[in-house]
Amino acid sequence: MQSIILIGKPNVGKSSLFNRMARQRIAITSDISGTTRDTNKTQIHIHSKKAMLIDSGGLDESDELFKNVKKNTLKVAKESDIILYLVDGKLAPDDEDRQFFYSLKKLGKPIALVVNKVDNKKDEERAWEFANFGVKEIFNLSVTHNVGLDELYEWLEKFLHEEFLIPDEEENLEDFLEHYEEGKEFQFKEVDQNHIRVGIVGRVNVGKSSLLNALVKQERSVVSSIAGTTIDPVNESVVHKDKVIEFVDTAGIRKRGKIQGLERFALNRTEKILSHSQIALLVLDAHEGFNELDERIAGLVAKHYLGVIIVLNKWDKSEMDFDKTVKELRLDRFKFLAYAPVISVSALSGKRVHVLLDKILQIFENFTQKIQTSKLNTLIENATRAHPLPHDYGKLVKIYYAVQYDLAPPKIALIMNRPKALHFSYKRYLQNQIRKEFNFEGVPLVIASRKKGSKENDES
């Protein structure tokens, strides 16, 4: 697995970028220079490829401690595959940054200059000054506002080779391919179609308990205006159209710096509950607005590959425009959950809460959907005919056949001659075509490419 290291002087936003790329808060972030002194690392995925992301300590000669941090950082950089050097876009380039950057460039590894904190037009104009670093790969970012990351991800993806799959999915896929006979329908795992497990998640005081009470029409959880009233997870089941829907009301997730005692335990329970859920109701506060913590909680949902419905609670108090809000969520804040339906409700008044029950049944049906192999391959043939697969350095890239190998969530294998040549943008095109033909609203769609007649996903 390739590794990506974030390097730069203190307080340029390395930890914030690390948290953004990891979709969770791992490194401590602060306005105080040099908050991160130790090396943090975590596995991430960029589009369909996985990598190890490393957050180094800040490069600074101002004290003895940071001299050691710099020495360690350079050592880790030598062992890494890709280097991202961060600078502060609100400050003019300085010779110290150039010196650090050139010393890293000599390592002969893929390296990019990341200009962070480019938050407005004035910052964009100033960022051009960094062109004198003499590097082609310069990316202007605003990590705080989640702007500019798509271009960076596309550049990084070119250097990553190892395909990302859900944990344990690699073994499942290889086992499937070993026993699958081309052209035959596959016997899927049994999923109880009459019992649906739904996790209710969101930050503190967005109205999760009120929503649960409205859904089951009784006071089951303690409801209060005090942030974080609900600590213990509460299960409640309802029967809707002959289906049992089991709800789990999770304790609200606070900002990490405020988590103490029972609240920290509740955060761990929340992730555990998601791991046992099939569908998540991601509850947002439409009256108070959205923040970075909402995005991190959404990242937990995406991490578990659940069916998902985004619930805009307290809509009766909101002044937001619904269409503009949905566009903001899908194109900006929750791009990785762009397939999720968005429903506005008022849990306290019960308005539109009933819509959620029907939507849960629909999403669960999509979540457990089985695609007939012949129909899937007809779609793939038509899609590749309309937009042929790009050649790989002059060599033909072919998809021999496609087959769904799992459900809940649905997973599709593309058997190819050159699986590594399948660019994420073409994979996304195929995903979009499949979503158009088959209803996968609210459901993640996993596509894995493999070499024909081999367990390997490469050219060897």
Curated annotation (Swiss-Prot):
EngA-type G domain: residues covered: 2-164, 196-368
CDD domains for this protein: EngA1, EngA2
Keyword Glycoprotein carried by entry: no
InterPro entries membership: G_ENGA (IPR031166), GTP-bd (IPR006073), GTPase_Der (IPR016484), KH_dom-like (IPR032859), KH_dom-like_a/b (IPR015946), P-loop_NTPase (IPR027417), Small_GTP-bd (IPR005225)
Domain KH-like: start-end pairs: 369-453
GO molecular function, one term: ribosome binding
Binding site for GTP 2: 202-209, 249-253, 313-316
Gene Ontology biological process: ribosome biogenesis
The organism's place on the tree of life at top rank: Bacteria
Keywords: GTP-binding, Nucleotide-binding, Repeat, Ribosome biogenesis
PROSITE patterns for this protein: G_ENGA (PS51712)
Gene3D superfamilies: 3.30.300.20, P-loop containing nucleotide triphosphate hydrolases
Keyword Coiled coil: no
Pfam families for this protein: KH_dom-like, MMR_HSR1
Binding site for GTP 1: 8-15, 55-59, 116-119
Oligomer and partners: Associates with the 50S ribosomal subunit.
Annotated function: GTPase that plays an essential role in the late steps of ribosome biogenesis.
UniProt xrefs under HAMAP family: GTPase_Der
Family: Belongs to the TRAFAC class TrmE-Era-EngA-EngB-Septin-like GTPase superfamily. EngA (Der) GTPase family.
Protein name per the record: GTPase Der
Gene behind this protein: der
